[in-house]
Amino acid sequence: MERKEKGMGIKARRLLAYIVLIIISILCLVWFYILFINATRSKGELTQGFTAIPSTHAWENWTNVYNGSIPIFRGMLNSLIIALSSAAVSTYFSTMTAYAIHAYDFRIKNAVFTFILMIMTIPTQVTALGFLELVQKMKLEDNYIPLIVPTIAAPVTFFYMKQYMDSVLPLSLIEAARIDGAGAFRIFNQIVVPLMKPAIAVQAIFTFVSSWTNYFTPALILHEEKMKTLPILIAQLRSADFLKFDMGQVYMMIAFSIFPVIVIYLVLSKYIVGGVTLGGVKG
């Protein structure tokens, strides 16, 4: 009887967990639904308030965006170059840094680890002025480099990689590879990186999304129309003259801009559950 009651208690908790997860999922997806609904509505319809039923102006909104003065495809290309490069650079070098802290013993190891974590507490806005002055002195305005190279130093990505590495990479495996004559870079690229694929995929998604949606830093550096990213172009569209302002076009452009994010997520999402679970459990 007691075992039966215990089993029913587990089922009740599981059912409650599923209900909560379903509610959270609906709350997350409803905003995407509203976005796509609004992308199908005209300027006049949007002023009448919210409706859950799609309208018939999607093609009209897309035509207006496509034929407008804003270079959306060039903006998407710029965003893709920056976001993909940032994701690759950030995850690879953060994994390498985490491996150095994990696998090697040196005198200031703990101090270095603490210093890297302290950097996480510094907001981007605090260092923006100095960063902009440095970019101007190096004559790197309207260039991808200042938006990609700094992602090498990504404390949040490093911390996640270090925690994940602690759970899946025993030092005995590294020692065995060293005994077999493998060098440091061979161990890292052929043993560590394959083991870290779930964590790399998770952080690649997060870094890609963060870079893709970043408006603040690109707006400081990119001024030429052909170099601007999608968030800057969307902001330009929103700040247009009131008489020419069409919110339907804005919603359509936002909907257009999130498709690459959805594709990246669908491609790499299978790693998220495994990556988060293994990264958060020691041993």
Name every feature range the model reports, one short phrase each:
Residues E5-G7, R13-G283:
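A structural signal for multi-pass alpha-helical bundles of membrane permease subunits
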